[in-house]
Curated annotation (Swiss-Prot):
Keywords: ATP-binding, Cytoplasm, DNA damage, DNA repair, DNA replication, DNA-binding, Nucleotide-binding, SOS response. This is DNA replication and repair protein RecF. One of its GO terms (cellular component) is cytoplasm. GO terms for biological process: DNA replication; DNA synthesis involved in DNA repair; double-strand break repair; SOS response. Coiled coil: none annotated. It comes from Lactococcus lactis subsp. lactis (strain IL1403) (Streptococcus lactis). The RecF protein is involved in DNA metabolism; it is required for DNA replication and normal SOS inducibility. RecF binds preferentially to single-stranded, linear DNA. It also seems to bind ATP. ATP binds at G30, Q31, N32, A33, Q34, G35, K36, T37. Changing V81I: In strain: ATCC 7962. GO terms for molecular function: ATP binding; single-stranded DNA binding. Belongs to the RecF family.
Amino acid sequence: MKLKAIELKNFRNYEELKLDFHPNLNIFLGQNAQGKTNILEAIHFLALTRSHRTSHDKELISWSQQEMKVSGVVEKAHATVPLEVQLSPKGRIAKANHLKENRLADYIGQLKILMFAPENLELVKGSPATRRKFMDIELGQIHAVYLYDSMRYNRALKERNAYLKFDKDKIDKNFLSVLDGQLAEHGNKIMLERQNFIDKLEVHAKKIHEQLTHGKENLKIIYNQNVKTDFSKELLSRQDHDIFRHQTSVGPHRDDLQFFINEINVADFGSQGQQRTVALSIKLAEIDLIFEETGEYPILLLDDVMSELDNHRQLDLIETSLGKTQTFITTTTLDHLKNLPENLSIFHVNAGTIEQEQ
């Protein structure tokens, strides 16, 4: 899978922009706050219809404009697929092959991406919400049905939480049980998919982590399900508690992940270097896992992470990705990028203008 070209209209600081990409490696070079990350954000938006930097869509639209559009051409093994995502006061429209997709689950996965940004280093030591988002994004690209169940679960969760905010004497437990059934139906599928994903991810990540640490460290990933027994029974047993607290206290929306090196919890006791190595091992593992599950390698987006990694980890990242994935890198300097291949494109970014090095 390759992204051949992208076109932006009123996206962030780009009023009009068209770029053709190298099928192997693309580097965006420039000082901070010039618009490098905006390009990777646009690719992320084209793939997932969402930004990785903000949940406020209005921030993506250029100043004084009312709408924006990101379009691109994706080259797959047996087809070339034009993609387009628009934002306007009327909402969001996603198109594949010039046809509007009414369901997000039918669009996501057309362009598979793997984003590695400084905030991804928070995967190990950040909040549980960060790790749940990680599972949701990656699984949503691999299995469309997961995205469908996740959306249905979140809709039911929102409805149940809103109902729990009613006065206690106005709550009908029979209706609450109906909502419980909807949560359990989709929540059970989510938990099963997450467990299968983590089991497979761990297999790949363990091998990579062992290579990165020269056999000195053994990585283990634990999926901590919030639901310990039967989801339906736990929801029923907690109804009074949830009515009192005005929120749903059990379910996959409270799941988490834990990472261990040689039986030591990395988040609590690992060094910063160990935490970074775990995050890197997981990202590199995803490359092969996505290919294993879908038959397509994802596009790799490296947003200013090279400066966060030492030379050894930089080399491991580049060597693992090149030859498999089309890679996009943003950086302020090429000094720390060693052993770059000759077949690449370098784009110089300055104040929202981009020039390709000849």
